[in-house]
Structure formats: C-alpha cells, structure tokens
C-alpha cells in the first residue's frame, strides 16, 4: 500500500500548480491523469495556442506553460494513463484510491472530465475524414493551404489567427456575433487572407481532386448557399464532458459540475475540487482563477490535516 498526504486527480495546468503548491508546504503528493502525457486538455488539443490571460505573460503558448509548471513539480509522483475508478473511506478517515493508494486528502482537478470533441454533423467518407481535425497539435500540416475553421469561440479565433500567418483561412460561424475576444475578431477582420462567413452552417462536404468542396447554408435563408474549396477543416465546436464517475463516488454536482464551498471543499470529507470541474456563484472559467483556487484548496487541506501548525500561506509572506 502506497501512502501519501495528498492525491490529485488531473495533471492539467491547475492540477500541476496545485501539486507544486502542495510541495511547497511539504505535502507528499501523487498525481493521476487518464491521458498518457502531462498537461491535460491544453497539451492534448491546444499546445500551440497563445494564452493571453496569465499574469506577467503578455502571451505564452500552452505547451510552454505546461513545461514551466512541470518544472515546479520536482517532488510530485505522476501516474499517467490511469483513470481513477474507485475511492473509499477507511476507518482512520483516510481515502483509499483504486485499492492501492492510501491518502489523507483528495483534490479533484479534472477540468470538464472525460472529454470528446463535438464532431462535424455531416456524412463523410474515410478520405474526407483524413482532412478533418479537432485539434491543432501540428500547425505545420496546414501551412500554405486553404483552411476552413468552424466555430465561434476563443479556440476558433486563436486557431484562425495562428494559421493566418501561413495559410488562407475561412472562419465560419452560425451566428453573426462571435463568443471569443472582440480584439481577436477585429484583428481577423483586418487580415486580407482571412474571410469571415456568418451566419453560416456546413451543409455538405465532398472530396474532388484531393480538395474538399464545403457547401455552406446561410442561417435563415432557405436558398442561400456558398461553396468553398478547402484543403483542410478544423472543427472547434467544443467538447462533450462526462462526469458520471463523480456521481458514482457520491460527490454533489450542480449542472454536471462539482459544488464546492468557499474553501474548495466538496460534500465528502477530505475531498476538495478546483478548476473548471467546479461551480460556485460568479465563477468564470479562467486558468488564472484556477491557480488561485489551487492555493485556497491546498491552504485549507493543510489546516485540515495539520491544525496544530502555524501556516505560512504563500512564499511572499513576511
């Protein structure tokens, strides 16, 4: 039986920072992630994305952010390709994780949980599927090509800005208004090699001479169609999340997210949660906010486990 002070489920940016902050306070920590690499959704889907809302970084790529967070985790043990399936409570109030790891506290930092991309709602062939993408791990494959990007959120806008450096881009959204940053929209509108097509939905997709013919239907206009010839398609429709495992453990959810107190405590003893997995009034899904939640959770875990200790809450304490 392996014993730890803290187990963290999720090795994305928020989980990584929580682990390093736990190390700072001397907690023996183990981290689990279902993916086969550290970094969570950012490393898996958006490693080249420029993140612009991290304090002190005007812009930092997702992969670089993960790398720097990992540098802080010299004492954390990581177990990858491991989806935690079972937790139970022992007589000594410790938590048994998957019948092998005994921990004093548990911190959930799983983001939206198991995620699958929302797929393009068109009938396609195997040949066509080779040109449809749901992430941009390797932007070089889009260079010097005509690329259609479907979606209206920050990911779609970020991808369009990135690919506009090397490609001709069609950004297609079902509404006239985009959900992402207005500054990104304005920048795209100023680029000659970017065309914004709104409000349009994909209607048909065919492969002809190794180039795709994408037929678009204008929303609200029964006979208004546009055809664009493209080499590659990037779909940014978001993800379907699955937190059924949390319900199985008895964790209280609110609209499929974990309900927490001001201390980031769940309804279960010694179980905390942070990041996009949680909800409370006024919360917004931002990485910087998740970092703060990690500090709140670890500080309260320390007080929970070691109430007799005088806490130094952060490295800048006098």
Swiss-Prot record:
It comes from the Bacteria. GO terms for molecular function: ferredoxin-NADP+ reductase activity; flavin adenine dinucleotide binding; NADP binding. Pfam families: Pyr_redox_2. It is an enzyme of class 1 (oxidoreductase). InterPro entries: FAD/NAD-bd_sf (IPR036188), FAD/NAD-binding_dom (IPR023753), Fd--NADP_Rdtase_type_2 (IPR022890), Ferredoxin-NADP_redctase_2 (IPR050097). Keywords: FAD, Flavoprotein, NADP, Oxidoreductase. Binds 1 FAD per subunit. The keyword Flavoprotein applies. FAD binds at residues 33, 41, 46, 84, 115, 276, 316. The keyword Oxidoreductase applies. Its EC number is 1.18.1.2. Belongs to the ferredoxin--NADP reductase type 2 family. Homodimer. This is Ferredoxin--NADP reductase. It comes from Lactobacillus gasseri (strain ATCC 33323 / DSM 20243 / BCRC 14619 / CIP 102991 / JCM 1131 / KCTC 3163 / NCIMB 11718 / NCTC 13722 / AM63).
């Amino acid at each position: 039986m392996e014993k730890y002070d803290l187990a963290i489920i999720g090795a994305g940016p928020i989980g990584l920072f929580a682990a390093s902050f736990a190390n700072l306070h001397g907690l023996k920590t183990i981290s689990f992630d279902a993916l086969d690499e550290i970094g969570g959704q950012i490393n898996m889907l958006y490693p080249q994305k420029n993140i612009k809302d991290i304090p002190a970084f005007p812009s930092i790529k997702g992969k670089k952010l993960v790398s720097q967070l990992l540098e802080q985790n010299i004492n954390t043990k990581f177990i990858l390709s491991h989806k935690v399936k079972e937790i139970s409570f022992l007589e000594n109030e410790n938590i048994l994780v998957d019948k092998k790891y005994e921990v004093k506290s548990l911190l959930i930092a799983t983001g939206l949980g198991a995620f699958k991309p929302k797929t393009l709602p068109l009938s396609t062939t195997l040949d066509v599927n080779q040109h449809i993408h749901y992430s941009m791990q390797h932007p070089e494959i889009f260079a010097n090509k005509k690329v259609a990007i479907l979606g209206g959120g920050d990911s779609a806008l970020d991808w369009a800005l990135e690919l506009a450096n090397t490609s001709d881009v069609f950004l297609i959204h079902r509404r006239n208004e985009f959900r992402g940053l207005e500054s990104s929209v304005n920048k795209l509108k100023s680029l000659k090699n970017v065309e914004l097509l709104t409000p349009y939905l994909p209607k048909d997709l065919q492969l002809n001479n190794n180039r795709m013919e994408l037929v678009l239907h204008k929303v609200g206009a029964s006979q208004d169609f546009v055809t664009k010839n493209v080499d590659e398609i990037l779909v940014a429709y978001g993800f379907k999340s699955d937190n059924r495992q949390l319900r199985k453990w008895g964790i209280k959810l609110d609209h499929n997210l974990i309900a927490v107190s001001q201390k980031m405590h769940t309804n279960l003893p010694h179980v905390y949660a942070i990041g996009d997995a949680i909800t409370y009034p006024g919360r917004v899904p931002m990485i910087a906010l998740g970092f703060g939640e990690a500090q709140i959770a670890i500080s309260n875990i320390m007080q929970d486990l070691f109430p007799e200790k005088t806490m130094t809450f952060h490295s800048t304490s006098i």
